């Protein structure tokens, strides 16, 4: 599907910002200049700029214009706004990656597992333990649960590559959304077995429930990250405070 005009402007400006065409702290071209360049309406330009504000690339300054505030994400950053496979994250951050499947089995969700993962009791599941290496060093230990009826052909060999690539390109599943929780937890025996924690006694844990386009939760994953490489980075926008009159 062709991109709408505001999306074309958004991506064009985003690429320029990331390439350093506009200095950090400097102003982007004015609305009138962008209207002339892209042959569009003022509302279209403003919609594109609003998306850049939302994504943390620019900030509007009343009476001045639109200011570039983009800072490149460090390679250790874990971003929350997108759903990425481990291999995709490694490519984005310029690191070499490898995945080892240290356990590949099946199980059925009982009440305890249902409460922990969100799968209904009785759901037939694949259960995997995987170790993700970055630049040859084990950095992430995963507990993966996948619905077997959503991917009956999953194998250990596939799991050593990219499961998401298999789901999207072979199963033709559309992966839509993921609910995530980040906690800090004490290191367990398996963490110490598979990750080189040294003097660290805790790690960052990202628990995610991922859904496909049919609204089916097909995956629950608990990713246990080495503290030295985990850094949460997101972009938050404060909405205007409600006045007392507006609260009435």
Language model regions located:
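Extended, compositionally biased flexible segments
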Residues: 53, 59-60, 71, 84-87, ...
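Extreme N-terminal segment that seeds HTH/winged-HTH DNA-binding domains in transcriptional regulators
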Residues: 1-42, 248
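C-terminal all-alpha effector/ligand-binding and dimerization domain
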Residues: 97-248
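Beta-hairpin "wing" of winged helix-turn-helix
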Residues: 22-25, 54-63, 69
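Short, cationic-aromatic polyanion-contact patches
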Residues: 4-6, 30, 67-82
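Short, hydrophobic-biased segments on the C-terminal half of alpha helices
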Residues: 49-50
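A generic "binding-loop/recognition-motif" signal
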Residues: 64, 86, 163
């Amino acid at each position: 599907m062709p991109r709408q005009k505001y999306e074309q402007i958004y991506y064009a400006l985003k690429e320029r910002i990331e390439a350093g065409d506009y200095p950090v702290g400097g102003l982007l071209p004015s609305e009138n200049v962008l209207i002339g360049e892209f042959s569009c309406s003022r509302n279209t330009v403003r919609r594109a700029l609003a998306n850049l504000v939302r994504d943390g690339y620019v900030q509007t300054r009343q009476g001045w214009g639109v200011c570039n505030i983009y800072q490149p994400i460090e390679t250790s950053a874990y971003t929350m706004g997108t759903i990425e496979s481990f291999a995709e994250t490694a490519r984005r951050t310029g690191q070499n990656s490898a995945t080892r499947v240290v356990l590949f089995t099946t199980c059925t969700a009982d009440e305890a597992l249902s409460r922990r993962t969100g799968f209904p009791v009785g759901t037939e599941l694949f259960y995997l333990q995987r170790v993700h290496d970055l630049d040859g060093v084990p950095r992430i230990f995963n507990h993966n649960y996948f619905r077997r009826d959503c991917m009956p052909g999953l194998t250990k060999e596939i799991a050593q590559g990219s499961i998401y690539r298999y789901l999207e390109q072979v199963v033709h599943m559309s992966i839509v959304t993921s609910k995530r929780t980040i906690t800090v937890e004490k290191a367990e025996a398996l963490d110490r077995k598979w990750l080189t924690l040294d003097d660290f006694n805790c790690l960052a844990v990202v628990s995610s429930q991922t859904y496909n386009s049919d609204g089916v939760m097909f995956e629950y994953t608990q990713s246990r990250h080495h503290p030295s490489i985990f850094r949460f980075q997101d972009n938050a926008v404060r909405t205007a405070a409600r006045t007392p009159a507006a609260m009435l």
